């Protein structure tokens, strides 16, 4: 995820401001992420900012506004960590930290039939993908990759510990392929991690003390530079 620059400066926008045409890719359609809305006024099409933050490019033709909010609004294909709060005949109702409870169909898993569908209990954690997000409907989840149909890491999260209340921007940084914090921790400690775009992170390691150390590092390193994160992690690991 790259920060978009305009005239050599990082682009910070406020609600109501228009994204300049010079920044918008003219090659094909554009995918708008959180914080951006499409408007059409007097035959003119424009992209307008709906919340304050920095403009980031998440792909060739994709962009979003990255803010330090903790309020999660579901978006299609977001990876989220949810908790089962109730069961019904066809599936589960899942808390993903948004204004609406999400639904997870019991057949929305890899290679599942009605006879082999998973049996999730109330309180269980799941790593899922948002398959439907509409402001007038409850979000829908799936536990498989949309392109391959494989689990690809989605499904029930067993054991471990879930961190909640992280800023959404912090989670976006954690999910990057080369994240300094997670790379530093991983070079010293083996662990499993699932990062949700809804401000939640699940961590599992060989013992409780190591899991607590990793969770502490994730919570405390949000505003540190790469060098500070490396030093902080090394100091924590010495205490094990």
UniProtKB/Swiss-Prot annotation:
Asked if Heme is a keyword of the record, the answer is no
- Identify the keywords attached in UniProt to this record, alphabetized: Cytoplasm, Exosome, Nucleus, RNA-binding, rRNA processing
Which residues belong to the signal peptide in this entry?
Answer: none
Chain's role: Non-catalytic component of the RNA exosome complex which has 3'->5' exoribonuclease activity and participates in a multitude of cellular RNA processing and degradation events. In the nucleus, the RNA exosome complex is involved in proper maturation of stable RNA species such as rRNA, snRNA and snoRNA, in the elimination of RNA processing by-products and non-coding 'pervasive' transcripts, such as antisense RNA species and cryptic unstable transcripts (CUTs), and of mRNAs with processing defects, thereby limiting or excluding their export to the cytoplasm.
* S1 motif domain location: 75-144
- How does this protein assemble? Component of the RNA exosome complex. Specifically part of the catalytically inactive RNA exosome core complex (Exo-9) which may associate with the catalytic subunits rrp6 and dis3 in cytoplasmic- and nuclear-specific RNA exosome complex forms. Exo-9 is formed by a hexameric base ring of RNase PH domain-containing subunits and a cap ring consisting of csl4, rrp4 and rrp40.
Subcellular location, record wording: Cytoplasm; Nucleus, Nucleolus
Q: Name one GO cellular component term.
A: nuclear exosome (RNase complex)
Q: What is this protein called?
A: Exosome complex component rrp40
Lineage of producing organism = Eukaryota, Fungi, Dikarya, Ascomycota, Taphrinomycotina
Instruction: Fetch the Pfam families from UniProt.
Output: KH_6 (PF15985), Rrp40_N (PF18311), RRP40_S1 (PF21262)
A molecular function GO annotation: RNA binding
Its source organism is Schizosaccharomyces pombe (strain 972 / ATCC 24843)
């Amino acid at each position: 995820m790259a920060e978009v620059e305009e005239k050599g400066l990082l682009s910070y926008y406020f609600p109501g401001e228009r994204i300049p045409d010079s920044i918008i890719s003219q090659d094909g359609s554009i995918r708008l992420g959180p914080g951006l809305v499409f408007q059409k006024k007097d035959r003119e099409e424009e992209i307008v900012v709906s919340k304050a933050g920095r403009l980031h490019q998440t792909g060739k033709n994709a962009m979003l506004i990255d803010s330090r909010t903790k309020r999660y609004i579901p978006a299609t294909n977001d990876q989220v960590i949810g908790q089962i709060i109730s069961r019904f005949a066809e599936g589960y109702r899942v808390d993903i930290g948004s204004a609406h409870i999400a639904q997870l169909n019991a057949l929305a898993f890899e290679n599942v039939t009605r006879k082999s569908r998973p049996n999730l209990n109330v309180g269980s954690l799941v790593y899922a993908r948002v398959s439907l997000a509409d402001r007038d409907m409850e979000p829908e989840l799936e536990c498989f990759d949309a392109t391959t149909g494989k689990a690809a890491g989605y499904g029930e999260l067993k054991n471990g510990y879930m961190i909640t209340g992280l800023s959404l921007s912090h989670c976006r940084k954690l999910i990057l392929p080369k994240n300094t914090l997670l790379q530093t921790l991983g070079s010293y400690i083996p662990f499993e991690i699932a990062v949700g775009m809804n401000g939640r992170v699940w961590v599992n390691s060989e013992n409780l003390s190591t899991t607590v150390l990793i969770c502490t590092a994730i919570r405390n390193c949000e505003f540190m530079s790469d060098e500070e994160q490396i030093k902080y992690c090394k100091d924590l690991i010495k205490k094990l």
